Amino acid sequence: MKKQIIYPDFITRIFSTALDLSLVAFIAIPISQFCFFNLLWLFFHDYFLSIKINIHNSNEMFNSIMSQEFYEYLKLGNFNKYILFNILIFATNILVICSYFITFWYYKGTTLSKMFLRMKIVDAVTLNRPTLKQLIKRFLAYITFPIGIFFILFSSKKQALHDRIAGTVVIKS
């Protein structure tokens, strides 16, 4: 006898995503903050030393980069460092988010919120565990999320656009 496949509805998928994003934020914020202040020191230690900032006081460091003096410092040929600093902070955040999703998807076939809601991600055709390539595609296709999530409403398998792109589907386990 064939096992019946149940596809989670739109609200359940949205709720699951909201839980995951809350959890990722909880994890990512301290990591991002740690990286932010360490990279800030690495890139701009000459500025902090020149204005005698207490580098152990993150508020002081942050306030100093919001000042007119820092703006003048950037205009003196340090703007490229500032751009690179921001790119690295962005990359750090993406890496943390990517690590959470792809690691859970790959090793557990689900995320913590989907596990709690008894859902899992499978290959849309075979219903087996998706390949790493599919999971990476799925993550990269999350860029379509704000619009792509509405595809669930019109799909018999309740697939969002990122599911279709990756060839995956979310089912109740």
From Swiss-Prot:
Keyword set includes DNA repair: no
Regions that span the bilayer: 24-44, 82-102, 135-155
Membrane topology: Multi-pass membrane protein
Any single Pfam family the record assigns to this protein: RDD
Source superkingdom: Bacteria
Keyword terms of this UniProt record: Cell membrane, Membrane, Transmembrane, Transmembrane helix
Main location: membrane
One Gene Ontology cellular component annotation held by this UniProt entry: plasma membrane
Location(s), subcellular: Cell membrane
Protein name, per record: Uncharacterized protein RP437
Organism: Rickettsia prowazekii (strain Madrid E)
